[in-house]
Amino acid sequence: MRYIIILAVLFINSIHAKITSYKFESVNFDSKIEWTGDGLYNISLKNYGIKTWQTMYTNVPEGTYDISAFPKNDFVSFWVKFEQGDYKVEEYCTGLCVEVKIGPPTVTLTEYDDHINLYIEHPYATRGSKKIPIYKRGDMCDIYLLYTANFTFGDSKEPVPYDIDDYDCTSTGCSIDFVTTEKVCVTAQGATEGFLEKITPWSSKVCLTPKKSVYTCAIRSKEDVPNFKDKMARVIKRKFNKQSQSYLTKFLGSTSNDVTTFLSMLNLTKYS
């Protein structure tokens, strides 16, 4: 009688054995499978071109499982197999190079005495305790990203896009220097060229307000010179004593005249 009961239980389990949902996702080559199904399963993986299956997990219930260490070649397809008794099901993946998603870069702004540095750190894969930048590595599909940085200055709501040249990049990240006296905010996005067509999410926005050690005034044409002269006159009056004010005011007047003359000459050259 006991044998009949055992056989009946095994028969019932085999009837209900079924994978009801399955999902594979790889972000920065951190690869996971998520699945639901009744009972416990043995899970194995086979790469294209290799006959044998690699056992990944034994007698495990539904859930999310890391399989990052098992696909041996990032450029070929592979299969994930679930087994419970006589029930078997295989799930196909076109390969990590096609399926992998790349996360956003990390953006840092650093102020120096005479400039601000924008540093864009490449997204990275985690291998054990090591963080390995995703940049022109054969074991990561030779992926490298070309970045676009969106700058916003002062109170402006319209971003100014700037494409980062790959010559400004190393194996760890990209670096450019720029100058502004206004508050600046930056966010960056990476994208690949070619058939893989990877596009990252935008990075978190970072902002920096420079220390105002320099007074500035934009001059685009000679019509802007009076505004420049008025602004600098206020600076002279508020920052310097009367003896210095007299000298600096004369210097400001002659400088303003020289700038006006120079801009007028440029304008004549432009239309000649």
UniProtKB/Swiss-Prot annotation:
SUPFAM superfamilies referenced in this protein's UniProt entry, alphabetically: Fibronectin type III
GO molecular function, one term: receptor decoy activity
Chief subcellular location: secreted
Induction context: Expressed in the early phase of the viral replicative cycle.
GO CC, alphabetical: extracellular space
Cystine connections: none
Glycosylation sites: 42, 150, 267
Domain of life: Viruses
Subcellular location(s) of the protein: Secreted
InterPro entries: CR4_N, FN3_sf, IFN_gamma_rc_D2_pox/mammal, Ig-like_fold
Function statement: Counteracts the antiviral effects of host IFN-gamma. Acts as a soluble IFN-gamma receptor and thus inhibits the interaction between host IFN-gamma and its receptor.
Family: Belongs to the type II cytokine receptor family.
Name this polypeptide is given: Soluble interferon gamma receptor OPG193
Originating species: Vaccinia virus (strain Western Reserve) (VACV)
Encoding gene per record: OPG193
